[in-house]
Swiss-Prot record:
Organism: Thermococcus gammatolerans (strain DSM 15229 / JCM 11827 / EJ3)
Region: Editing domain, residue numbers: 1-144
Keyword annotations from UniProtKB, A to Z: Aminoacyl-tRNA synthetase, ATP-binding, Cytoplasm, Ligase, Metal-binding, Nucleotide-binding, Protein biosynthesis, RNA-binding, tRNA-binding, Zinc
Subunit text: Homodimer.
Subcellular location: Cytoplasm
Record's protein name: Threonine--tRNA ligase
Gene symbol of the encoding locus: thrS
Length: 626
């Protein structure tokens, strides 16, 4: 089922003609209709809904009621609308579903009108235009999923969870999202719309996909499951540097690095309970008669290590870290999108044991700042992402100053999602979300304070009196999945490209940092000498020794976003200098090679290094994409 929900000043319709041979019988009174101050729900019932119409009705009513509460609507207009899908259900099934939705909404106390089914209708609608005024929902019955495999927490959330959305300013003002003035905060507006609509389906290819293919970084792998990618040498270099960078930052912060298995037993008592808190989207592996699932995070392995460890209050906060290569999650095929949403991904995952809420909140703030620092290092500033903070109403009342301080640290308004009661294992969570060129958002950094899993897994520490206590646990990924960081970097550069600016990777991440171009074969030896000096200084350099004309060689380097282009001819060889084109500012300068080495070293100081991923000479390189 597809639904388009519009909060409107009014919706009115008038029947014009039959759209089906046997439409729903109607009276003269039903040929026209109008409701004011209404939530208009345009619905396409789909073929897949025929598998379990009753389930679809229940889910649809829950979604409609959720939105109605958010926009404070007491009137609902159910409007059959075939144009939201190309895979429609049989007319008799669709009509029955629509009637039951109408009936159940009336039972809940709403004033409901339903437009006739099977007719062409003229309609007028006045949308209110606030951030919650236009939302979409997709509902799919869980055909073939046995009762015991269904996700307990997810079912509960669908029935009971109601989110209240606000914008919190750095000054501490909490404003209902539909009353906030988004002027000057267009990216936040896009994020709010995406977050509330919950539409994860990718209907177009995001620009980063074109860039990852053009630059021969990453590609789809037809020999594997969808959402499992292949990395060419340049892409593997970028990914490897990011993995090393985040790991170094987390270890520097004080985490102990561990390694744990990628698969776990479905029947392990603690894991079975934990799985019930997550959607049933695991890869399943069988070994003999036993069934295992591939991990979707490092939680399992780290929790089991902590369970077996003897931990004193003197050891707290205790930070443990693993870079999972890989974590797995069987996302729906329609949600898969380049590097943004995958089925196999690399997740930097730190878990911190804290003795009490005070220590946990202190760590939370430190890890919030750590996440900002990590993203800044990959070229993403607070202007490039939006913040969401999630908690219960009680937590807000008890910790307002702490939450406001988070908004002050980031220096701009943030999205707040608040609940009346806690449905999840955490009491506080934040994410830094990147909004891409298709107005889709993806969570990067995140930290959560977990109040359930210590007891669930039997993780304890000994306090000052020698008594065993259950700690709190913080889940932290300071960057988010490495693939998503690559996605965000490429999408940011695509935005700059669309604005007529020169895109480029951060210098420390550029697969080739310097390209040396000899004007002729006569100076190839000097070009190789220059390249040797740069390589000796741990700078990634290559030499264009192809037969292309000089202008074409320069254009080729520009197209590859090479930060420094050195053109060498007889003058440079005789004077032992280099002529350098800087991509960053577009300037061309003549300088000593030592000065260029010093400049690059200064700009890459503090970041990891890996050697050139491809042969030195361009003529020796294979082409990975036709």
């Amino acid at each position: 089922m597809r639904m388009l929900l519009i909060h409107a000043d009014y919706l009115e319709y008038e029947v014009r003609d039959k759209a089906l041979k046997n439409p729903e019988p109607i009276s003269d009174e039903q040929r026209k209709g109008r409701l004011d101050e209404v939530l208009a729900v345009f619905i396409s019932v789909e073929k897949v809904d025929e598998a379990n119409p009753e389930e679809v009705v229940g889910k649809a009513v829950a979604e409609i009621e959720d939105v109605a509460k958010q926009v404070k609507a007491e009137r609902i207009f159910v409007y059959p609308f075939a144009h939201l899908s190309s895979e429609l259900a049989k007319p008799d099934v669709a009509l029955e579903v629509l009637k039951k939705i109408e009936e159940k909404l009336k039972e809940k106390g709403y004033e409901v009108k339903r437009a006739p089914f099977g007719y062409y209708k003229a309609f007028k609608l006045s949308c209110k235009g606030h951030p919650l005024a236009e939302l979409s929902r997709t509902i799919v019955p869980e055909e073939g999923v046995s009762k015991e495999e269904r996700n307990i927490a997810l079912e509960k959330e669908e029935k009971e969870l109601v989110s209240y959305w606000y914008i919190l300013t750095p000054e501490g003002e909490l404003i209902e999202v539909d009353k906030f003035d988004f002027t000057g905060h267009e990216n936040l507006r896009k994020f709010v719309n995406y977050e509330i609509a919950k539409n994860r389906i990718a209907d177009r290819e995001p620009p980063h996909v074109r860039l990852m293919l053009e630059h021969e970084l990453v590609d789809y792998e037809p020999g594997s499951d969808a959402g499992n990618l292949r990395y060419y040498p340049k892409g593997r270099l970028i990914k490897g540097l990011l993995e090393q960078y985040v790991t170094e930052k987390v270890v520097e912060y004080g985490a102990m690095e561990v390694e744990t298995p990628i698969m776990y037993d479905f029947e392990h008592p603690a894991l079975e309970k934990y799985l019930n808190r997550f959607p049933a989207r695991q890869y399943i592996v069988k070994s003999g008669d036993k069934k295992f699932f591939l991990r979707f995070a490092a939680c399992f392995g780290q929790f089991l290590i902590k369970k077996d460890a003897i931990i004193s209050y003197r050891n707290l906060p205790l930070r443990m870290y693993e870079l999972t290569r890989y974590s797995f999650r069987r996302e729906k095929s329609g949600e898969l999108s380049g590097l943004r949403r995958l089925r196999a991904f690399t997740m930097p995952d730190m878990h911190t044991v804290a003795k009490d809420l005070k220590q946990a909140m202190d760590e939370f703030k430190k890890q919030y700042k750590l996440s900002m620092e990590v993203l800044r290092g990959v070229g993403l500033t607070p202007d490039d992402y939006e913040v969401a903070i999630r908690f219960t109403h009680d937590f807000w009342e008890a910790n307002k100053d702490f939450i406001v301080e988070l908004a002050k640290i980031i220096g701009k308004p943030v999205l707040i999602e608040m609940w009346d009661q806690r449905f999840f294992y955490f009491i506080l969570k934040f994410e830094f979300n990147f909004v891409d060129n298709l107005d889709k958002a993806a969570a990067l950094s995140t930290v959560q304070i977990d109040v359930e899993n210590a007891e669930r897994f039997g993780i304890t520490y000994y306090d000052e009196e020698g008594k065993e206590r259950y700690p709190l646990i913080l889940h932290c990924s300071p960057s988010g999945a490495i693939e998503r960081v690559m996605y965000a970097i490429l999408e940011k550069q695509a935005k700059l490209q669309a604005q007529g600016k020169k895109p480029m990777f951060p210098l420390w991440l550029s697969p080739i940092q310097v390209r040396v171009i000899p004007v002729s074969d006569d100076v190839l030896d000097y070009a190789l000498y220059v390249a040797g000096k740069l390589e000796g200084a741990k700078i990634r350099v290559d030499v264009d020794d192809t037969n292309d004309r000089l202008n074409k060689k320069i254009r080729k380097a520009e197209k590859e976003w090479v930060p420094y282009i050195i053109v060498v001819g007889k003058n440079e060889k005789e004077q032992n200098t280099v002529t350098v084109r800087r991509r960053e500012d577009g300037k061309q300068v003549e300088m000593q090679l030592e000065d260029l080495i010093r400049e690059i070293r200064q700009k890459t100081e503090g970041f990891p290094y890996k050697p050139r991923p491809l042969p030195l000479l361009l003529s020796r390189r294979p082409k990975f994409r036709g």
